[in-house]
């Protein structure tokens, strides 16, 4: 499974790279803290809503710590999803710690 760190993601976003961010946490978690520009597709809905993920774009999937996002990537791969998928190492917690301390931790 491909991975990307929060710092690497920030550098790529700042450079203007066209990266799709998918957040697989629950709606209450998303409303509390989110990475700007991310789209919420909770893990339990990922299979039903997989067509909302643009396979032509590099996609970074994240959750709180990286576990649910890894599950989401495995599920998508099992269905034959062909796009480039990366797991955000440490999830939104790493984003808050390493990139943007204004993103609340829980």
Residue ranges and their predicted role:
Residues 1-20, 27-58, 67-106:
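Rhodanese-like catalytic fold shared by cysteine-dependent sulfurtransferases
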Residues 62-63:
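Short, surface-exposed ligand- or partner-binding patches at beta-edge/loop junctions that are enriched
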């Amino acid at each position: 499974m491909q991975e990307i760190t929060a710092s690497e993601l920030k550098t790529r976003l700042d450079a203007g790279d066209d990266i799709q961010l998918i957040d697989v946490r629950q709606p209450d978690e998303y409303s509390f803290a989110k990475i700007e520009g991310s789209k919420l597709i909770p893990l339990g809905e990922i299979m039903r809503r997989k067509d909302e993920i643009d396979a032509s774009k590099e996609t970074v999937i994240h959750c709180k710590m990286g576990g649910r996002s890894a599950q989401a990537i495995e599920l998508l791969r099992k269905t034959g999803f062909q796009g480039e998928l990366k797991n955000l190492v440490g999830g939104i917690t790493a984003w808050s710690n390493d990139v943007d301390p204004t993103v609340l931790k829980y």
